[in-house]
Regions:
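Low-complexity, acidic/Ser/Thr- and charged residue-rich accessory regions of DNA metabolism proteins
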Residues: 328-423
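Short acidic/histidine-rich active-site segments
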Residues: 207-223
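An N-terminally biased module of ancient metal coordination in phosphate/nucleic-acid-related enzymes
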Residues: 1-95, 386-387, 399, 404, ...
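Cys/His-rich short segments
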Residues: 250-316
Length: 423
């Protein structure tokens, strides 16, 4: 049974998150996307936890579904209890800022974790709480509370808040998690890296690489995801596959093109400076406009820690895609949130779920279903025939199947290069 999972999202109780991130809306969007199992996000927040208990009911072991009396239709979506925790602390003489994704087997485990954390930390102010605790100590607390929990370092390359982040991360897993390192089974790529980039680190050779959307609004669900082939859809089976890196059951991940991630290249957003690692080296990591340190992006950081060449043998494969809304927007040359894009997106996903359109439907059927340019864009995205302007310092990159968005992005980059030449 093909199962598509997106474990990392946020609720309406997190900062800068859509009010549409609530159980029934999430369930409806998950079905439109073709997502089978969706993380709840934010289980540490009392308000969100209360809402989850009120609106969800047990389904398969460790999974939940919307209550039938609340949802208009019998939902096929399953929820798994998840949260992202932000650890900010000092270790080995440096400030560390690490985000951890946590999967929990049931509400009892969640309540025990929350009870432990609430003694020392404020869980009310943000769905993704900021905790002044060493990531190692937090992992130990959670695993001692319930060993069935799964702890996954989130978006491990993001400069500011991640395990390997250039600004406040570590160089090795062991430096962060010490003796618990063998119990950290999986690592999340984040939008600015793909599995190939992670394969360049030998310390990740025996670890599972997963990908999730980190969605802050319903339409962003599934922009990255994990595809399993499971005989039994349960919490224990999902976590077993992840822990064991079971390649027979873990079929592939769905990825952003990493250049679209907002920290792929180095740069300085305020000065509109975007640089490749080679260009950054020439400028000695200093912004050529304001002469302040550049934000070192994911590609550069991977290069600095890499100790082996890319080898796909024995790895869980991946497929790079462009979200359907973005393809439609690119083809129609209108904003992704425009009415024209919304209408076409809703029309197409009434016929098939988005993932089926992006991954499975034949070119012939796509041409009968959609505008020929949209069909071509989907096929081009599948085959990697796209143009790319990398993101940098919090600015999303541009991935285009038509070249229209790319041309605009290249013009902006060219202006930045000309500006560099003045200093």
């Amino acid at each position: 049974m093909k199962i598509i999972c997106d474990f990392h999202i946020h609720s309406k109780y997190s900062r800068a998150v859509s009010q549409g991130m609530e159980p029934i809306t999430l369930s409806n969007w998950a079905e439109r996307k073709g997502i089978t199992v969706l993380g709840t996000g934010d289980f540490t927040h009392p308000g969100w936890l209360k809402e989850l208990k009120e609106k969800l009911e047990p389904a398969e072991n460790g999974l939940f579904r919307p209550k039938s009396q609340i949802s208009n239709l019998k939902s096929q979506t399953r929820f798994i209890l998840t949260a992202e925790l932000s650890c900010i602390y000092t270790k080995n003489g440096r400030t560390r800022k690490i985000h951890l994704l946590v999967l929990a087997p049931d509400f009892q485990a969640v309540e025990k974790i929350n009870a432990q954390l609430s003694w020392s930390f404020n869980l009310v102010s943000d769905g993704r709480p900021i905790l002044g605790i060493d990531a190692h100590n937090l992992a130990k607390l959670i695993l001692e509370t319930d060993e069935r929990c799964l702890i996954i370092p989130a978006h491990i390359w993001t400069p500011w808040f991640s395990l390997f982040g250039s600004a406040s991360g570590f160089d090795t897993i062991e430096e962060c998690f010490e003796e618990l390192s063998p119990q950290i089974y999986a690592f999340e790529t984040g939008l600015s890296s793909d599995p190939e980039m992670n394969w360049r680190l030998s310390q990740l050779n025996n670890k599972t690489i997963i990908s999730n959307s980190d969605a802050h609004s319903p339409s962003k669900l599934g922009r990255e995801a994990n595809v399993f082939d499971l005989d039994n859809l349960t919490y224990d089976e999902i976590t077993r596959v992840i822990k064991e890196n079971d390649k027979d059951k873990f079929k592939y991940t769905v990825e952003f093109y990493p250049e679209e991630g907002k920290y792929h290249f180095d740069g300085h957003r305020k000065c509109e400076i975007s640089l490749s690692p080679e260009e950054t080296k020439k400028h000695h990591n200093i912004c050529p406009v304001c002469h302040r340190p550049l934000t070192i992006g994911v590609l550069n950081r991977v290069e600095s820690l890499a100790d082996q060449e890319i080898n796909a043998e024995g790895r869980v494969p991946f497929k790079s895609l462009i979200p359907l809304e973005e393809i439609v927007s690119d083809v129609f040359s209108v904003g992704v949130k425009s009415k024209r894009v919304e209408e076409e997106y809703l029309r197409l996903t009434e016929i098939y779920p988005e993932f089926e359109i992006l991954l499975d439907i034949s070119e012939r059927e796509l041409n009968s279903l959609a505008n020929p340019q949209i069909a071509k864009g989907i096929m081009d995205a599948r085959e990697g025939r796209v143009t790319r302007v990398p993101g940098y310092d919090g600015v999303f990159g541009i991935i285009s199947v038509t070249g229209k968005k790319e041309a605009k992005g290249r013009t902006e980059i060219k202006k930045e290069k000309q500006q560099i030449g003045l200093f």
